[in-house]
Design a protein with these regions (language model features):
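Conserved N-terminal beta1-alpha1 strand-loop-helix module at the mouth
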Residues: 9-122, 127-136
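Acidic, serine/threonine- and proline-rich low-complexity intrinsically disordered segments
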Residues: 1-11
Length: 137
């Protein structure tokens, strides 16, 4: 599990982590932009190391429920700040008000995409869209 730190700088003070949209391994940007790296771990440091070691190949990272539960909104923010697009795979499914608020938080920290269950119905799905849009503004 991720330990508590005062800031993201403290969390990563011993790590060198620089993301470049230019690939050193000559992976074309149009390919890199279509690939997502699934960060299916429960530790933000491990996720960051994994993304850092593979940044030449992926333009998007997927933050799932496991990592988001362990590290919270920082699990999205640290990767958007590093230049990745973030797909937040939280599978939102609740009352529309709750889904709206959750999607707004995820959007405010930079997630480009978030999943929501269609079985939640039209009102809930619209709430997810509106929340993500509001958070991104």
């Amino acid at each position: 599990m991720t330990e508590k730190y005062e800031s993201l700088d403290e969390l990563f003070e011993d790590e060198e982590f620089e993301i470049s949209k230019e690939s050193e391994d000559n992976v074309p940007l149009e390919v890199k932009s279509r690939l997502a790296l699934a960060l299916d771990v429960d530790d933000l440091i491990d996720a960051r190391r994994l993304a850092g070691s593979l940044f030449d190949f992926f333009g998007t990272v997927k933050v799932g429920l496991e990592l988001y539960t362990a590290a919270g909104p920082d699990s999205v923010g640290v990767f958007t700040e590093a230049g990745f697009d973030v797909f937040c795979d939280l599978k939102l499914h609740d009352i529309p008000t709750t889904v709206h608020k959750a999607a707004r938080v995820v959007g405010s920290v930079g997630a480009r995409w978030v999943t929501a269950h269609a079985s939640g119905g039209e009102e809930m799905l619209k709430a997810a869209v509106d929340g993500l849009r509001e958070g991104a503004e």
